[in-house]
Amino acid sequence: MRIRPDKPGPGQESVWDYPRPPRVEPVSGRVTIELNGQRIVDTTRALRVLETSHPPTVYVPRADIVDGALRDADGTSFCEFKGRAGYLDVVAGDRVAAKAAWYYPNPSRGYEQLVDHVAIYPGRMDECTLDGELVTAQEGDFYGGWITSRGVGPFKGAPGTWGW
């Protein structure tokens, strides 16, 4: 299957121009995350991971997540680039979003910036924003990319795209 990347307009970037292996860089702008009517993240210190065909995955500093909003969850997964990830439940009041976040306690060489940062699936939260823009979650139940008007695809994640 031949993929035809969408052409980016002014101020946009194509996920097909992102590198593989992925690159880590600072997010320019403010990141907010809300669950159960509570703002659990409000930061200007987030990082994003850029990988070919994926919308950016946003990692927020643990220190910028409201106390008590994270709790350990069972299970791990492995990324060929970043290493072994652990999972976290996200908690706000009486609501628990099971395994809605992940982190790399000992990331692989080249990804050390991700220590003490957590990625949260935007589709499992009530609202995520990037610089005031409402984020759309990447399709599928594995990847946690943040789609905004700044990025164009097509994006990996939907059924039939795993082989890209």
Regions found by a protein language model. Give the residues of each.
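Terminal leader/tail segments of proteins
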Residues: M1-W164
